[in-house]
């Protein structure tokens, strides 16, 4: 009888531990989603100049007279099997104090030196935004690059995360010492955002991507750190296809 009672107590304890662990996982997943929700709920931002009038997270790092600078970036990275990794993307710095925007369009290719070590070869094209149009600030001979810049759209302009709750049973990671956190979800090719990416980019795989929400800093909010989203289609040695996007407010350098 004593053995039976001990067995019952042991099983009850295991159930309690499993329930507690599962509860913590669900709670942390909700926290990660909430940390991204304020920014992602603004998507799509069709007119980027609307960001001049949008508030972001502020803390003691900001001067009281500083409205902050929005930093927005999108990049597509493709490496077919056995080939070089190539990427194209853009980053803009949108100063809310002066309502001016500058940035750069970046074309990158990963090469290898004589010892086989990877080395990135980047070409940067300075840009500015006027009347919601992105234009080069220097002459560009390559007409294809010029068109890519003029037609460039950030994911924040067409992506949609109106209902983060639809993403469930994610792979959650949290390290309070760094601190860093992430949530990963398997998507389908029927997902709205996946369709939008395939519409705009030549993605050399039919595999449905995983959505990764990753960040660093205080989960409740911080101007120090980052919050990125990534759509990973392929991730293996010598073959990669992924898209990254970020939007966050930082203290302005002119303050």
UniProtKB/Swiss-Prot annotation:
UniProt signal peptide: 1-23
Residues with lipid group (S-diacylglycerol cysteine): 24
Pfam families: DUF576
Keyword S-adenosyl-L-methionine listed: no
Keyword annotations of the record: Cell membrane, Lipoprotein, Membrane, Palmitate, Signal
GO CC terms, sorted: plasma membrane
Protein name: Uncharacterized lipoprotein SAOUHSC_00055
